Structures are given as structure tokens and as C-alpha cells.
A protein has these predicted regions:
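Surface-exposed beta-loop interaction hotspot
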Residues: 92-154
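Short helix-loop boundary/capping segments
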Residues: 131-194
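Beta-strand/loop nucleic-acid-binding surfaces
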Residues: 54-75
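Short beta-strand elements
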Residues: 230-251
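Flexible glycine-rich surface loops and low-complexity tracts that mediate binding to linear polymers
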Residues: 70-100, 225
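Bacterial Sec-dependent N-terminal signal peptides
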Residues: 1-44
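Short, solvent-exposed, Trp/other aromatic-anchored flexible loops in extracytoplasmic proteins
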Residues: 75-78, 186-224, 229
């Protein structure tokens, strides 16, 4: 029940809040053991890519490189953020306290939008009002170096994820304050759209690194605060708690 409920939640979230998705063709395919939104990360020098899950903090290691063949883009690189179905290697079983599993099959369900935090916020020239940040069914979450933001916007033309930017503003005690900014639009826009973007924390950028280092965790927990311009001069604010070491750990 837990597995199917989570799959339904994630599937609904991806279908509603992504600009584009990629679904498997053909029959229903393998009977997967679980479904996850995952980050595809490079493994150690002795191994290939691994998957780090959002839901339970599991790490999935493929038994062969071919297992992840379906997660490759046309240029041969791996998509960084995807929703997948996972079949555990024979003999593996989800066990309380165990965080690492070997997997024999991985099926691509959807590709999430992902991009880096903007590190040149002073060059952004426009800011249009968003309708909302998150809603009762789709909340902001942060894990494995990504801040995942569902939001609703207005437009008169087709937009893509490069028309939206998340950047760090300041550190306040245990909180990293960020701002989500829509830079393409129109003040009289009337069409409403929804999106989900996974924003990657750029720890290789010195200014961001220094700002993040000023955040003071409480027992390894920090708060990421996302702000945005709302309609009628309203300030939109959403917050999420996450592990500081987990957010750093992918880099």
C-alpha cells in the first residue's frame, strides 16, 4: 500500500508539474518493486552511476551498466532527475534500517526539469508575478542537492524552464533564503500554467558556497525558504526542512 500510494503521488506530481515527460512505450512492462523520483549520480572511480532516491533516502546500485541504458539522453549523458520504476535484484528485499540496494531493472517513467541555481541574479532584468508556490497536493521538497519547487504562473506565450530562476538571497541563522523569479511574461497575461523544477545547488560557485556556509544547522537540519513575487503585490513564501549534510553530500 505504501509503495502504490507513493507511486501515485509522484506520478500525479510529475504529470501536472513538468513541461515535458517521457513515458515508456508498449505494454505495462516489468512488475516493479517500487517507484521513486531519483537523482542519477556518478559512482566511485571503481563503479558506474548510482541512483539516490527522494522518498526513503535509499541508494540503488545497478548490477550492470546496461540497467540504466534507458536513462541516457541522445548525447550519451544520463538525465540527472527522473521518475523510475525499480526492480530489485533477486534475493534483495526492502529491509528496515537498510539503505543500499542492488537493482536489476530500471524503467524510465518521466524526466524532470532540472537546472542549476542562478548565480548571476544581478543580471536578471524582469520579475513577473507568480500565481502560487506549491499547493495542498504538491509541496516543495529538498534532498540530494536539489530544491524541488512546484509553482503556478501566468503567461501569454509558451514558456520553458529557462524563464524561471532560483537564486540564493542570504543566510539567516538556520535558514537559506532563496527567490524564485519569472523573467519572461506579461503583466496582462491570463493563461495559467503549472511547473515543477528541480534546482541544483551549485556548491562549485564560491559566492553560493560562502552563503550556504553561513547557515547554522540545528542538529544537521536547515530550512530552505523560497520566496517569490505574487499577484497584487503579495509576497509568496514556502519553506522546507532538509539535512545540511545530505544537501552537501552529493558534491
Amino acid at each position: 500500500m505504501k509503495k502504490m500510494k507513493l507511486a501515485a503521488i509522484f506520478a500525479g506530481l510529475v504529470s501536472v508539474f513538468t513541461f515535458s515527460s517521457c513515458l515508456n512505450d508498449g505494454d505495462s512492462g516489468p512488475n516493479y518493486d517500487l517507484y521513486e523520483i531519483v537523482t542519477v549520480e556518478d559512482g566511485s572511480i571503481f563503479g558506474g552511476p548510482i541512483l539516490k532516491g527522494d522518498a526513503w533516502g535509499y541508494t540503488y546500485t545497478p548490477v550492470a551498466s546496461s540497467v540504466l541504458a534507458g536513462l541516457k539522453a541522445s548525447d550519451g549523458s544520463y538525465y540527472k532527475r527522473v521518475q523510475v520504476g525499480i526492480k530489485l535484484m533477486e534475493g534483495e528485499a526492502i529491509t528496515e534500517g537498510k539503505k543500499s540496494y542492488k537493482v536489476s531493472e530500471v524503467g524510465l517513467i518521466a524526466i524532470l526539469n532540472y537546472k542549476d541555481f542562478n548565480v548571476q541574479a544581478d543580471t536578471l532584468k524582469n520579475e513577473y508575478a507568480l500565481v502560487s508556490l506549491e499547493d495542498s497536493n504538491n509541496k516543495i521538497w529538498a534532498i540530494n542537492g536539489y530544491v524541488n519547487v512546484p509553482f503556478t504562473f501566468k503567461t501569454k506565450e509558451q514558456l520553458n524552464m529557462n524563464d524561471f530562476h532560483l537564486y540564493a538571497v542570504e543566510a539567516k541563522e538556520d535558514t537559506l533564503v532563496t527567490r524564485l523569479r519569472q523573467t519572461k511574461g506579461a503583466d496582462d497575461a491570463y493563461q495559467t500554467g503549472g511547473a515543477l523544477i528541480s534546482f541544483h545547488m551549485p556548491f562549485n560557485d564560491m559566492e553560493f558556497y560562502e552563503t550556504f556556509n553561513k547557515v547554522v544547522p540545528k542538529s544537521d537540519t536547515i530550512v530552505v525558504k523560497v520566496t517569490a513575487k505574487g499577484e497584487n503585490d503579495k509576497e509568496l513564501v514556502s519553506t522546507v526542512k532538509c539535512s545540511a549534510s545530505n544537501m552537501r553530500g552529493s558534491y
